[in-house]
Amino acid sequence: MTEQQPVAVLGGGSFGTAVANLLAQNGVPVRQWMRDPEQAEAMRVNRENPRYLKGIRLHDGVEPVNDLLATLHYSDLIFVALPSSALRSVLAPHAGLLRGKCLVSLTKGIEAQSFKLMSQILEEIAPDARIGVLSGPNLAREIAEHALTATVVASEDEDLCQRVQAVLHGHTFRVYASSDRFGVELGGALKNVYAIIAGMAVALGMGENTKSMLITRALAEMTRFAVSQGANPMTFLGLAGVGDLIVTCSSPKSRNYQVGHALGQGLTLEQAVNRLGEVAEGVNTLKVLKAKAEEVQVYMPLVAGLHAILFEGRTLNQVIERLMRAEPKTDVDFISISGFN
């Protein structure tokens, strides 16, 4: 049997830990780097990530570490699970070590200052690296508990996709491939905003019709925006689009859903985020997405409505009334409507 090449995972959160465990279960030696030396030591001793994945045993093949330079030297396949706000500051000082390596982003976020996706930041930091993204309906705890799960690895580099499939694909985790890196990654980032809306709707006792309407109109809205930026609309009918949107907008395990649910219960945004105790990328994404949609003149009423509630002092009832009074458009944007003429 061929010995597996070592792999690195950057980030000590729930998803980074779940992916590290998956790799180790497939016989891959893994170093999982995190900034907090106390967290690394506790995970190494107790074989658990109590803050982010309490009750899930850390596989013996995962080595939690705090030495970033040694970790970057360790492997030429690196999964990057850093918060969007930290990715650039962590990796830019070590750009030279990333040359020629395979960097796969696991982070579903957008950089506020530039509106760049995480893989685009990786490209900027390390133009000679091979870049990919992993995205889909992937709740970290369910992955860690071996629930049947599928995901998408996306890259223009077919060999990179095949390599990621080889190390991650297993009995409970299926890995599909796509060449639409931008569309796959954008879908993962955009759906976080709509999960906040869905969580609010549930907390407020809205009906199943309402929740279904929100999810399908969210899909139309995020697809419309993505296509304006050059993505393939068909990507949004797959795991990284509608698949990720459904699970994130339906599950109390979703961090962004939890924030929305707390808001619907009457908490302030600050209180909701503090109660979560983790990063909810949707809050940051909402701000930059609202500005970008206005800049490129893409109609995104759900984004505008949530922004009005969280940052403009509008009430939910005011926003709902405005949304329901808006002129209804066609149901699906990307099919011929000539029959209506």
Curated annotation (Swiss-Prot):
Entry EC number(s): 1.1.1.94
Signal peptide as annotated in the record: none
Catalyses which reaction(s): sn-glycerol 3-phosphate + NAD(+) = dihydroxyacetone phosphate + NADH + H(+); sn-glycerol 3-phosphate + NADP(+) = dihydroxyacetone phosphate + NADPH + H(+)
One Gene Ontology MF term: glycerol-3-phosphate dehydrogenase [NAD(P)+] activity
Source domain of life: Bacteria
SUPFAM superfamilies: 6-phosphogluconate dehydrogenase C-terminal domain-like, NAD(P)-binding Rossmann-fold domains
Active site: 191
Positions bound to sn-glycerol 3-phosphate: 108, 136, 191, 244, 254-256
Subcellular location: Cytoplasm
Pfam families (UniProt xref): NAD_Gly3P_dh_C, NAD_Gly3P_dh_N
Gene Ontology BP, a term: glycerol-3-phosphate catabolic process
Pathway(s) of this molecule: Membrane lipid metabolism; glycerophospholipid metabolism
Chain's role: Catalyzes the reduction of the glycolytic intermediate dihydroxyacetone phosphate (DHAP) to sn-glycerol 3-phosphate (G3P), the key precursor for phospholipid synthesis.
Family: Belongs to the NAD-dependent glycerol-3-phosphate dehydrogenase family.
Name used for this protein in its record: Glycerol-3-phosphate dehydrogenase [NAD(P)+]
Organism: Pseudomonas putida (strain W619)
